[in-house]
Amino acid sequence: MAYFHWAPDLDAAAYELEIYGEERTDLPEDAPGRGALHRTERLYTNSALIAMGDILQPGETYERLWWRVRPLNLDREPIGPFSALQSYMPARGDWQQTSPLPRAHFNGERGSSILYPVYSFTPMENAASYEVEVTRREPENPEGTAPSRYRVFSKVIANANLYDPSPRIGTYWWRVRAMDSEGRPLGGWSRAEPFRTDPADHWQVAVLGDSISHGGGRLSYGPADWAYSYAHYLDFPAVNLSESGDTSRMTVDRFEKDVVPFHPEYVLIMTGTNSLRAGVPASEVIADLKEIQQKARDQGITPILMTLPPINPAGIRRAFDQPTASDWQAAFQEVNAFIRREPSIDAAAPFRQWEEMPEDLAMDGLHGDWRAKEMMARVINEELPRLAPDLKTF
């Protein structure tokens, strides 16, 4: 496999990659070139693993390849020019790469300790599916193809992101392998990536909510793309206990299981968006928030509610083909009015000038893009110290 990697464009939903067998000086910046050995528009991360058989004809060999890439929007329309042509001299390891490459690296950057991991990797163009394996210890067979004896979870998926349905408290490893259309391995396992989310680390602050807090946006980016998580921009350490898909009731129901073991001093709570857009009455969401507050206080945890940013029903319909309750704005206003009367942070304040979330801040109408997450984090960084005077910052 040939491995290509480039700096991400955080406004892109996809990328177009062209590969040439010689250096070219006649390629237009704003249009595809002629004579490419390979071209694809179906790249959703800033990297690609492409089989040599998809690039070269039988018997062809090249000591050097040349490539370029440009960002695309959701409709696969360019939003920028092609990059400058770059040379690629395939190293032995690149040519022989037979497994996907992990992209999710936990516990390194700010906001990268999450209870519900998302296993993200660079896919292989010739693969039909992938098996992700999670183990309790480092796998004993890094060069093998069999499951590890330490396996605790695995799942076969067709895309390059697996949302773990279970909370992972403690230390684990994850890895992935590619399979063909018959379910046969195309190669071995990827390197095993360790990750740790442990109450023994004594987190002072926890983040609790749905996918808006879990992270991700612009359809192609998930929670392991840290630039799309507001926790990445916080000035203080925080463990992310959020789970994508949560309604306010679901957040209530998992409080004892997911929050209590960590026993943070403060829990930042943002939940209810999925409930309100589905037509759940504001009064029910408020009741759920009150129940979360009480559960926290009963455990000696200080609950801090956060207001809900607006959504964009047209964007949600376009991205997910889902309807939005017609009275969502009034419901959001009622819930946010309650939140503002409580110990809270007005995370929705940066968006008060808009009745709906602008497309350039949330392309899918629901999940804020990196700019929106940065704006939310700025408010949290400004407001939390008054509610948490003993806050430990970086």
Question: Predicted regions span which residues?
Answer:
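Recognizes extended acidic, P/S/T-rich segments that occur
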Residues: E18-Y62, V134-P167
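Serine-esterase "nucleophile elbow" of acetyl-processing enzymes
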Residues: R184-S244, R254-H263
